[in-house]
Amino acid sequence: MAATNTILAFSSPSRLLIPPSSNPSTLRSSFRGVSLNNNNLHRLQSVSFAVKAPSKALTVVSAAKKAVAVLKGTSDVEGVVTLTQDDSGPTTVNVRITGLTPGPHGFHLHEFGDTTNGCISTGPHFNPNNMTHGAPEDECRHAGDLGNINANADGVAETTIVDNQIPLTGPNSVVGRAFVVHELKDDLGKGGHELSLTTGNAGGRLACGVIGLTPL
């Protein structure tokens, strides 16, 4: 008598019950079904099949960014500036610069991260909106206008700046641009000097550093 085949489809997990039989048989299976013939089924009382879905790794993506700039100059002025930003919020800038003369010094973000010719080659203030120079709180200002930092009697300036015009991501990202600390006080565009509306008449460039991303 020719063996007959039975095709049973199942979904996972499932249990296939096979009645006893006196005819020898082999068992063949695949993902979509099970093929049985009637030979030797008496050796199998039940077969359990379970298909386990592949587990997916949980990936947590952080939108936080962190960057740093190390400032160097031709004088003894040097410093470190760190930047952090969470999601699309404002950027927090922590500044520590040493070797300054006591008092206020203009502190700006410049357009280029090019220091091949010293701080001069960093270009003008970062100004994607084509505004005139102003104070950080002014509506009309360069994005790179960060005001003044004040050095103490030891020549050390430490401050924290929170600003929403210097993001670490997006089309106006400041990564790859440069911070510059200046010789003089920034007049914030209100000094009436011919340079007030471009540089704040903040004088020479003492030190600069290019912004680069760092691990969180």
Curated annotation (Swiss-Prot):
Residues the record lists as binding Cu cation: 108, 110, 125, 182
Presequence positions on this chain: 1-62
Phenotype when the gene is knocked out: Growth retardation (e.g. delayed flowering) and abnormal chloroplasts (e.g. less organized with fewer stacks). This phenotype is reversed under very low light conditions. Enhanced tolerance to oxidative stress.
Record localization: Plastid, Chloroplast
Transcription regulation keyword on record: no
Cysteines paired by S-S bonds: 119-208
Family from the record: Belongs to the Cu-Zn superoxide dismutase family.
Protein name: Superoxide dismutase [Cu-Zn] 2, chloroplastic
Origin organism lineage: Eukaryota, Viridiplantae, Streptophyta, Embryophyta, Tracheophyta
Gene: CSD2
